[in-house]
Amino acid sequence: MDVIQRIKEKYDEFTNAEKKIADTILSDPKGIIESSISDLSEKAGVKSEASVVKFYKKLGLNSFQQFKVLLAQSISRAPLEIVYEDVSSEDDTKTITEKIFKATVRAILDTLNWLDIDSIERTVDLFKNAQRIIFIGFAASAAVAFDAFHKFTRIGKNCLFSNDEHIIAAILATASPSDLLVAISHTGETISVVNFAKKAKEMKMPVVTITGNRKSTLAKYSDVVLATNTKETKIRTDAMTSRIVQLVILDTIYTLLAARDPRAIENLNKSRLAVSELKY
């Protein structure tokens, strides 16, 4: 078991006290190896050692010593330092820059370890067979949805995108089961996105969701859920990091689709030529 990954996967299920313990561990995993149960409860600011016991039992472990052994193994396997350091007002430009870059790289690698390859394969098949691909997302997710709309259009897929609810409603009114809805929402709880996914399912249309919450309301109306794995800090929200990870997931689907379809490369070359004529 990769206990650090396990903590991240179960984070949303933790109580407030357990989240404090998780945050303390993730911020300094090496330091926890040298700590006792009482040390950890004190560092985390929880009332009793019983909270720590409940925490490691929720991970499926029998003792704090077993937890520390698995934690040490997780650290030894890590390709780079496992930290989600928060930005401080005392940090200089170099330190803040390094923290942001490391957090983003860490989030990408964590999501890679978390992703189900079968879900990626199924998503590629849905993209390949879709008559039309409808991308939806609002606020920060709209930028990701538009980027995907642009990419997949260039390899010849019939794509639609809008961040206007009225236009999306009109598009879905004429959609069919042979179309595909791709819903992008970090929380998975944006009311309009959930409603559009629900509408798509009522029409027997497949839905692929990219979200940071596998157990969200949106996920319930999805055929495939591709979940990101990011962590929020005091200044930088996890939604900021998840946007980058969402783009990487869509880049992966795009590359797999293009690599398996000779027509995609041909269409990409055509679109490159067309765009080049618009430049000096």
Curated annotation (Swiss-Prot):
GO molecular function: carbohydrate derivative binding; DNA binding; DNA-binding transcription factor activity
InterPro entries, per database record: Homeodomain-like_sf (IPR009057), HTH_RpiR (IPR000281), RpiR-like (IPR047640), RpiR-like_SIS (IPR035472), SIS_dom (IPR001347), SIS_dom_sf (IPR046348), WH-like_DNA-bd_sf (IPR036388)
DNA-binding residues: 37-57
Presence of keyword Transcription: yes
PROSITE patterns: HTH_RPIR, SIS
Domain called HTH rpiR-type: residue spans: 1-78
A GO biological-process term: regulation of DNA-templated transcription
Entry keyword set: DNA-binding, Transcription, Transcription regulation
Residue stretches making up the SIS domain: 123-263
A Pfam match: SIS
PANTHER family in the cross-refs: GLUCOKINASE, HTH-TYPE TRANSCRIPTIONAL REGULATOR HEXR-RELATED
The protein's name in its UniProt record: Uncharacterized HTH-type transcriptional regulator TM_0326
Organism: Thermotoga maritima (strain ATCC 43589 / DSM 3109 / JCM 10099 / NBRC 100826 / MSB8)
